[in-house]
Amino acid sequence: MKIACYPFAAGADMEENLRHIRLGVKAAAEQGARLLCFQECALTGYPPVETEIESITEEKCVFGLRAVSALARESGVCILMGTVLYDGGRRYNSALVFDEKGREICRYDKRALWGWDAENFTPGERDGIFTLDGIKIGIRICFDVRFPELFRALFDAQADLCVMPFCDTAEHLPERRRILTGHLRTRAAENVMQILSVNSLSRYPAVPTAWFDQNGRIRKQRNKEGLLLCEVTVPEEDFGMQGRRVNAELFREKRT
């Protein structure tokens, strides 16, 4: 299955963000992508780095998500969209998945909150797992990558792929990028699971937009705006993958 992501520099202007999103959807449709993934808060901008939380109203979010739903329906491409989301009087840092008919089929709310996120959002409780064309896909967002427990839940659910929207940017911190890339490699290898990360380009990306295989190797990456297209399959497990899976299951049984 062709799965793509489209990194760009989001900001406070939702119409401008939607312009970039439309470009991504057009490119994905032309390349035959089944699912197109965008970064953390791609629709609204990530507060307070790319915009201010006070400027992200519930009405704007509803308008933007309706536009994204329409894009999915018109293009026939499923879309995973990072956004601020209002629900039940609470505000979340979320990723929503719309199918090719524009229907919401999955929602994940960021669970690991600290600093700005803890001030602006409510922690989520959803598992963020859906299946598309036989491939089981989980979602985790940005700071979640620091917590192995959140990914072990995907292992337990036998997820084939984890999509990770980020807005982790800085002026220029190559050491931080190496550390966070290491986290992604480890989360992929220890859970025998592919990972597709997509990060904002509003500043220096401290996390690569990249596709990691089940052994933690980077298969593809992109550090400028445009489409990163991946042919995601569920390969036969090699000797090392089998060993990690068997032992992880053994340790899980001991925990319970």
Where are these regions (language model features)?
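Extreme N-terminal starter segment of soluble prokaryotic enzymes
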Residues: 1-4
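Short polar catalytic/cofactor-binding loops
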Residues: 7-13
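Cys-nucleophile CN-hydrolase/nitrilase-fold catalytic domain and related Cys-dependent amidase chemistry
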Residues: 14, 23-100, 170-193
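Structural motif
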Residues: 34-35, 137, 161
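CN hydrolase (nitrilase-like) catalytic-core segments centered on the catalytic cysteine
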Residues: 64-78, 146-227
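Conserved beta-strand and immediately adjacent loop positions that scaffold enzyme active sites
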Residues: 80, 94, 126, 208-209
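Active-site catalytic loop in hydrolytic enzyme cores
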Residues: 86-157, 172-182, 238-255
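C-terminal beta-strand edge segments of enzyme domains
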Residues: 107, 129, 200-256
